[in-house]
Amino acid sequence: MEISWGRALWRNFLGQSPDWYKLALIIFLIVNPLIFLISPFVAGWLLVAEFIFTLAMALKCYPLLPGGLLAIEAVFIGMTSAEHVREEVAANLEVLLLLMFMVAGIYFMKQLLLFIFTRLLLSIRSKMLLSLSFCVAAAFLSAFLDALTVVAVVISVAVGFYGIYHRVASSRAEDTDLQDDSHIDKHYKVVLEQFRGFLRSLMMHAGVGTALGGVMTMVGEPQNLIIAKAAGWHFGDFFLRMSPVTVPVLICGLLTCLLVEKLRWFGYGETLPEKVREVLQQFDDQSRLQRTRQDKIRLIVQAIIGVWLVTALALHLAEVGLIGLSVIILATSLTGVTDEHAIGKAFTESLPFTALLTVFFSVVAVIIDQQLFSPIIQFVLQASEHAQLSLFYIFNGLLSSISDNVFVGTIYINEAKAAMESGAITLKQYELLAVAINTGTNLPSVATPNGQAAFLFLLTSALAPLIRLSYGRMVWMALPYTLVLTVAGLLCVEFTLAPVTEWFMQMGWIATL
C-alpha cells in the first residue's frame, strides 16, 4: 500500500535524517519569528545556537540544508538583508575562490601525493619515525595545500592497502565487501585487528599534522585567508606573524606524536604486522614494474607544478584562488585530462562546502546587524591589552572545538576589526589579536571532529568503519594533542607573541601597515 502524501513529504524532508532531528528543525523555524517579534537580540543568539547545533550534528545531516533553511528564514523575517549577505560574500570572494579552485587544483596532483605517502609507509620500518614522518608530511603539505585534500589522499592510501590485505586474508581475489570479515580465519583476524590499530594511529597523526601545518600559513585553512585579508597580510607576513605561536606549538605537537607512540597511550603504538608489510611490498613492487613512461612523466609534471604552487604563494604572484586555477589548467593540460566530466569530478569535494560557507556569511550578517557579539567584545576590551590576547584565544578555542573554524574565525576577526576602526584598540593591538584569533580558532579545534573539517571528513569516509574509528575513539585519540596544542598555544600567546613580534619589527622583517 502506498504511503500518504503527508508521510511522503515527511520522508523527503531532510531525507535519512532522524525524525527527532527533523522535528527539532521545524520547531526552530516556527519559534524564531515569534522570538524575533519579542526580542531581536535573543532571536539572533538563538539562531547562532541553532546553527552551531546543525554543525555539531553534521553526521545526521550535512549542515548546508538545515543551516540554509535557517539562513533563508532569517533574511525573510528581517534579521538581516539579502544585500548585506551579498556584501559579506563579496568581501570574502578570495576565500570562495580558494575553495573552488585550489581544492580542485590539488585533486589533479593526487597521484604525486599518493606516491609520497606510499613510499613513506613502505620505506620506514620504525613506527615512531613513520608516525613522525606522516605528521610532518601532512603538516608541510597542509601549509600549502587544502587540508581536506591531504587527508583524502592519506585515506586513499589507507583504503587501498587495507583492501589489498583484506583480499589476501579472505582468500578471495574479487573481495569487494571490505566490511565482511566472515571469510577470514581466526589467525588472520588477529593480524587484521593489529593492522586496523596501526592505520587508526597513522590517520590521527596525519589529521593532527594538517592542523599543525594549516595554522601556519594564510592558505592552510579557509579562515586563515579571511584573517589575513582583514589584517592586510600576504603569505610571508602571515607566516612570520604566526610563528611566535605556531613554531613552538609545532615542536610540542611533534614531541607529543613521539611520546604517545613510545608509551602506547590513547590507542597509539600499534606497529605494522610483518605479514601485512610483505603483502603490501609485493603489491607495490608489481605496481612499480607496471608503471609506464607516461605515468612517470605525470609524476614529474605534478612535482614541477607543486614547485610552481609554493613559489607563486610565497611571492604572492596572484590571489590564492587564481593560483589554484592556474594549477588546474597546468595539471590537466600536461597530464592529458581533457574530458569535461573528468575535470568536473575535481569540484565535487569543494562545492558543497563553498555553498555552506556562503550560508556562514548569512549568519555573520545577522550577527553584525543584531550586534550579537558586542557585549562579549566589550567585556574583553575592558581587560588590559595583554589579557585581551589570552581572552580572545580562549573564547575562540571554546567555540571552535564544537563549531566550524571558518564560522568562528570570521565572527571574531570582524568584531576585532570593528573595534580597531572605532578607536577602541590600536592597530598594533589589532594585529596581535588577529594572531590570537587565528591560533585560537585552529589549535583547540582538534578536540572534536566538529571543529576540524579534516577530522569530520575522515569520520564520514569509507575508511572509518573499516578501521573501527568511531566519534568517541577519535575524540579519545585526539585528547593528548588537544591538551598539548591548546595549552602550548595559550602559553605562547601569553608570553612569546608580543615580545617576539616586537623583535621582528625591530629587525625590519615585519611592519605595521
Curated annotation (Swiss-Prot):
Keywords: Antiport, Cell inner membrane, Cell membrane, Ion transport, Membrane, Sodium, Sodium transport, Transmembrane, Transmembrane helix, Transport
GO MF terms held by the record: sodium:proton antiporter activity
Subcellular location(s) of the protein: Cell inner membrane
Keyword Lipid biosynthesis: no
TM regions (residue ranges): 23-43, 52-72, 97-117, 120-140, 144-164, 202-222, 238-258, 303-323, 348-368, 391-411, 447-467, 475-495
GO cellular component, as recorded: plasma membrane
Primary location class: membrane
InterPro entries membership: Na+/H+_antiporter_NhaB
Membrane-topology annotation of the record: Multi-pass membrane protein
Catalytic activity: 2 Na(+)(in) + 3 H(+)(out) = 2 Na(+)(out) + 3 H(+)(in)
Matching Pfam families: NhaB
Function: Na(+)/H(+) antiporter that extrudes sodium in exchange for external protons.
Similarity comment text for this entry: Belongs to the NhaB Na(+)/H(+) (TC 2.A.34) antiporter family.
Protein name: Na(+)/H(+) antiporter NhaB
Biological source species: Escherichia coli O127:H6 (strain E2348/69 / EPEC)
Gene: nhaB
